Amino acid sequence: MVAYTELFSSFLRRNQIKLNEPMSRHTTFGIGGAADCFVMPETIEELQKVIVEVTKANVPFFILGGGANLLVRDKGIRGVVIYTGRLQSIIHEGNRLRVAAGVSTAKAAKAAMEHGLSGMEFAAGIPGTIGGAAYMNAGAYNGEMADIVVSVLSCNQNGQLSVYNKSKLHYDYRHSLFMENGEIIVEITVELAPGNIHDIEVMMEEFNRRRRMKQPLEKKSAGSTFKRPAGYFVGQMIEEMGLKGFAVGDAKVSMKHAGFLINDGHASCTDMMNLISEIKRRVFDGYGVELMTEVQIVGEE
């Protein structure tokens, strides 16, 4: 049995360490069993120390940002969940912003607007943190993180920091280098273009208006559940298979947008995974298209 509190007590306060923490409190789905240990570093140095300690103790760890695009299994997560949400710095440097991984994507987009920088409007309504968005190359409305990220500061499992410039980031559709090398995104630098604050704000408001109209923002959801196959619209296929409103327990296909799955009450991960499996089966039978989940599924099976 790992004495988690002792592992981190020399450099974290007691209120930065939680034991048996329900992950349902930390995901936008509102689903997930308990993590053995949940830690909340507040500086890059604390994050490095946490990673060094878990590596030395041979304890598995998982990096958590805003909990969007994430489905945690009902048995929870073994080892340590490292929450980046207290890393909150934003530094303005000319046409660039250096943004800590834990800053929400919406907050980063607002900061860009306030500095009269255009190019991040697409991200204003993307849920989760900027670190998570950079990790998965999140995108919307014909924009994606690969368009604006020029460098990433990351931390490896030995606690060492590295800077990767744009050419090394291996960005592709919902993919980045950090899905390959396992390093933790600590901070990103985005390069934007000078713009008119009013025009930027109007565009952000328009994108958010469209989201409110088309997406079930009032429900517990992880965003788009499936990656978009070339030449198809996922929501349209699911709807044409008669699955709009279809449910397994409290896991349900949104009536507002069939590409979104929602927790309509107290859904379990098992409910949601069974719903995902049924959708995949029906779409494959109807279209011959194999849907791939965009949502990351983690935890003890």
Residue ranges and their predicted role:
Residues 35, 68-72, 105, 131-135, ...:
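Short, flexible micro-motifs
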Residues 2-130:
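Anion-binding (especially nucleotide phosphate/pyrophosphate-binding) glycine-rich loop
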Residues 32-33, 38-44, 71-89, 135-166, ...:
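Structural signature of FAD isoalloxazine-binding scaffolds in flavoprotein oxidoreductases
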Residues 18-19, 155-282, 286-301:
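Phosphate/pyrophosphate- and phosphate-bearing ligand-binding catalytic cores of soluble enzymes
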Residues 70, 109-112, 120-124, 137-144, ...:
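A generic local secondary-structure boundary/capping motif
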Residues 57, 64-66, 148, 219-220, ...:
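Short, basic and Ser/Thr-rich N-terminal targeting/leader segments
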Residues 92-96, 100, 105-106, 119, ...:
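Contiguous, small/hydrophobic- and glycine-enriched helical/loop subdomains that border
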Residues 3, 24, 42-45, 103, ...:
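Conserved active-site and cofactor/substrate-binding residues in soluble primary-metabolism enzymes
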